[in-house]
Each structure stands twice: as C-alpha cells, then as structure tokens.
Amino acid sequence: SVVDKTKVDDLRTDTTGNITVDSISDNKTNLGLVNAFTDVSLAAANISVTDVVTLAQANTIHAYNTAAGTTVTLSSVSDAFSNVETLQGTAGVVMTGATITTTTAEAVTKANVTDLNNFTTAKVTVTSVQDSRSNVSDIAAINNAEVDMSAAAVTITDAVTLAQANTDVGNLNSLTTGKVTLNKVEDGRANVTTLAAIDNDDVDMSAAAVTITDAVTLAQ
C-alpha cells in the first residue's frame, strides 16, 4: 500500500528492523526526511510528489529510488521552459498529469507552448511569452483550462499598429494583465504618438524600432 511520512513514522515505532518502502506519496520536504532515515529504504519505491517541484528538486527525489523500473510521479512543476523540457525527457519521471508553470526566467514561444501542452493533460501556465503578434494571439486563444497566459509578460517581436496594440477588447493588451512590450511599431505618425502615450506598465514601446507610414514634416 501507499505510505506517507506519518505512516513511515508509525512503522518505525513498531519495529527496530529496517523498513523497505514499495510506494510513497508525500511532499518533497517529507520525502527528503524519509529518505534520510537510515533504517528506511526508498531505493525500490515508486514515489509520488504531492507539491510543486523544480527540475533540481525532481532530480534530487529521483535519486532516492535507484532500482530499475521505479518511477517518480509529479503533480506540479514550476521552472524555466528548458528545465521543464529536460524534466519531461528524464527516464523514470512521470509528469503527464502534472500542472506546469513556466517561470519568467525564460520567455516561451508558440512552439514551446505546443510542446508544454503535449507534456501534460493538466493546466499549463506561462508567465512570460515572446513571439510574433499572430503567434501570441494564437496562444491566448487556447482555453485557459489548458494553457493560461492571462497574466503573462508579453513581448511582440514583429511590427504592430496602434489598432493591434490598443487597450480595447480584442487587441494585444486585452490578452494579458501583464505588461506588453513592443519591439517594432509601424503606423501613421498620429497613431504612433497615441501608442507611445499609453502607460508603459500596460504597453511599452520605449525601446521599439519605429516606422512612420505617412508623410511627416521637419516640424513634426
């Protein structure tokens, strides 16, 4: 049967002999405490982790069970995309039902999000996105129960207009409550001026390459 640290503690009071665990489910802290017991072996145990872990933490736990065929099943993962990707490819680690959060340490693209959504049947939350306007819109269109970017910091890599970046519903700033950063802007002078006047906490074009599409005078 599946045990947790509380049950292991009970077993240790019942016997002075060594205890071999076949299956354990608990949070990462308790799993570490159980593994540290000199009279308890997790080497042949299938391990389920009940709280969120990073790649480094999952690797630590995966070192507890060294027997062939044993698994570490994760319920929640939070790390940079490349670390999540590495974890997904780690033999003996199961994350097909884990919630996944990619951190701001690494912005994700539409292609990355597609991979993440294929890693798990549970919800994927992305906190930083960087891609073309079309691809960012595609990510936002995915049901939030599958992929949620509603609070992500977003960087748009191709040129956008005022209409595309406006705060009105249906445009870029409506896709997230996070900051939208524009790398390129291309529009008429008046529209670019209006766009630049939007609060930088909402839409920031302060470092954008700007192309003015209509005629301007020296005075303008």
Positions of the model-derived regions?
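General marker for long, soluble alpha-helical cores
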Residues: 1-220
